[in-house]
């Protein structure tokens, strides 16, 4: 199964001090054992790198970014102008009462167009948008 991986899950896996670290490791272990793969967007990757940059410094952030980019179980989708437009029109407009970021909306649009039902995430925005979380 392919699951969408969100920034929070990537951070949790990378930081032993993160409140979700143990849970993230267990979810990732089960997903890998089942032959699972991940997909995500360049926006999520950029958010992750930014968090690592400020939490761990440039060298560690580059190393973690490089490891993700080399990992064959992860596929990264570019944030094309069409994808950004569709995400805004379909998700930010539809859920105007929610605090969804553009990154959230792009995530939902990718999941929708790629027929991905599950997200490896720790925020409930995915459930609000109609998707399931890996558990």
Task: Label the model's feature ranges.
Residues 1-40, 53-66:
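Short, well-structured N-terminal submotif of metal-dependent ribonuclease cores
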Residues 10, 45, 126-127:
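A generic structural signal for short hydrophobic patches within well-formed alpha-helices
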Residues 75-117:
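Active-site neighborhoods of divalent-metal-dependent phosphate/nucleic-acid chemistry enzymes
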Residues 108-135:
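Acidic, PIN/NYN-like endoribonuclease modules and their adjacent C-terminal/linker elements
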């Amino acid at each position: 199964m392919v699951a969408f991986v969100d920034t929070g899950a990537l951070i949790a896996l990378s930081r032993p001090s993160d409140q979700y670290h143990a849970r993230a490791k267990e979810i990732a272990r089960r997903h890998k054992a089942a032959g699972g793969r991940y997909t995500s967007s360049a926006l999520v990757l950029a958010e992750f790198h930014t968090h690592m940059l400020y939490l761990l410094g440039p060298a560690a952030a580059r190393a973690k970014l490089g490891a993700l980019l080399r990992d064959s179980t992860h596929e990264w989708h570019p944030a094309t102008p069409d994808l950004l437009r569709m995400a805004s029109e379909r998700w930010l407009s539809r859920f105007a009462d929610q605090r969804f970021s553009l990154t959230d909306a792009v995530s939902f649009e990718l999941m929708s167009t790629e027929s991905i039902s599950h997200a490896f995430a720790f925020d409930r925005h995915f459930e609000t948008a109609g998707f399931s979380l890996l558990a």
